[in-house]
Curated annotation (Swiss-Prot):
One of its GO terms (biological process) is phospholipid biosynthetic process. This is Probable lipid kinase YegS-like. The lineage of its organism: Bacteria, Pseudomonadati, Pseudomonadota, Gammaproteobacteria, Enterobacterales. It comes from Serratia proteamaculans (strain 568). Binds 1 Mg(2+) ion per subunit. Ca(2+) may be able to substitute. It comes from the Bacteria.
Amino acid sequence: MHPPAPALLIINGKGAGNEEVRLAVQKLRDENQTLHVRVTWEQGDAARYVQEACQLGVATLIAGGGDGTINEVAAALAALPAKGRPVLGILPLGTANDFAMACNIPLIPEQALRLAVKGRAVPIDLAKVNDQRYFINMATGGFGTRITTETPEKLKAALGGVSYFIHGLLRMDTLKADRCEIRGPDFHWSGDALVIGIGNGKQAGGGQQLCPDALINDGLLQLRLLTADELLPTLIASLFNDEENKNVIGAALPWLEIDAPHEMTFNLDGEPLKGRHFRIEVLPNAIECRLPPNCELLGQTQSSQ
């Protein structure tokens, strides 16, 4: 019987003291799993550890953290040549863990680590923005972006994903639309947008399904935007139910361009990017990721195999 293929865990510094993670790592090592561990301290560390992982010849690179950590590791993997590229594994340790939750990845560290090293590897899409930045889960613009950026760390630590919603309710007085124009294949819209979601994954902001039809292996991004032609009570209802609403506009596109007369901010898996022009395109089958059989972000082709 062959020994398990080696893996490297890149863990966000905030989770380095997690006792459950330490015990899970030790348990796998006791089962002869070669598992290297590296801890990030500042921006760019994850990318450097990805290069080290290639030198070590690991089969799996595990991102231990929230959506931002997964983003950084996935982006560094996408920049590698396909031949010999490690598979992405995920250990959810963030505040909301939106991508992991939508994939049905276990939140218990030992279960997540076992999936990350032994699970089925499937090709998944990534999205690229302005030919320089990536996202694996979602890009959000408008009011929702300001809320996730401004939610205090102490509130996030105490309440988790629901903190975004609570902070949003407290900041409704600052509700302001972004005027912009959005174009894509057979799609054109211009006007004032309160919330813009461009999903490779389904949910953001602590479990809110902003792009409920998105899949990570269909070669498309789901655009969903909420226009400003809306009264506040109806706006809140529109964000949290599936009822038809003429002010909720959606499309499935392989690429789209957004232009604004003023500077806008988009959150790419929680990391801000400012600008007046954004070109966002899907990269089909960009990397491989170890996912559970019941992953709800995979289309029928993959999930039924």
